[in-house]
Amino acid sequence: MVPNGLFAGRKLKKIRKKFRWNDYRYVRRMLRIKEKYDPLEGAPMASGIVLEKTDVERRQPNSGRIKVVRVQLKKNGKVVTAFTPGDGAIKVIDEHDEVLIVGIRGRQGRSMGDIPGVRYKVYLVNGQPLELLRKGKIEKARR
């Protein structure tokens, strides 16, 4: 039974506060779960060094191999897998290049579609947009 008197505001607020803990988004935000377990530590993007170029198998019902790079993050040394979007994008990226990675925009920060275990995608290579390098609009910077 919920109080409904003229001065019941404080009690109503207290009850609402209690029920907020049933919302998983509220719980994740309050307990700062993303910052604790995310390799990017809650940041939208991070830079790192390419360790190796590899590929992963697509998930069913699709088939094929997706080109990815293993990146060691500068901020904490963790190694993550990043997707290289676009046709021929893997040819532009070399080992020991500095890349900027962003989230791949999957549900709740997870992997997207048929790409298993890959949560990030490459955005910049040595400070230049991967899309423009791929299309040949700009040349790759010498390091």
From Swiss-Prot:
Listed GO biological process terms: translation
Domain of life of the native organism: Archaea
GO molecular function, a single term: rRNA binding
A GO CC annotation given for this chain: small ribosomal subunit
Alphabetical UniProt keywords: Ribonucleoprotein, Ribosomal protein, RNA-binding, rRNA-binding
Pfam families per UniProt: Ribosom_S12_S23
Role according to the record: With S4 and S5 plays an important role in translational accuracy. Located at the interface of the 30S and 50S subunits.
Oligomer status and interactors: Part of the 30S ribosomal subunit.
Family assignment from sequence similarity: Belongs to the universal ribosomal protein uS12 family.
Listed name of the protein: Small ribosomal subunit protein uS12
Taxonomic lineage of the native organism: Archaea, Nanobdellota, Candidatus Nanoarchaeia, Nanoarchaeales, Nanoarchaeaceae
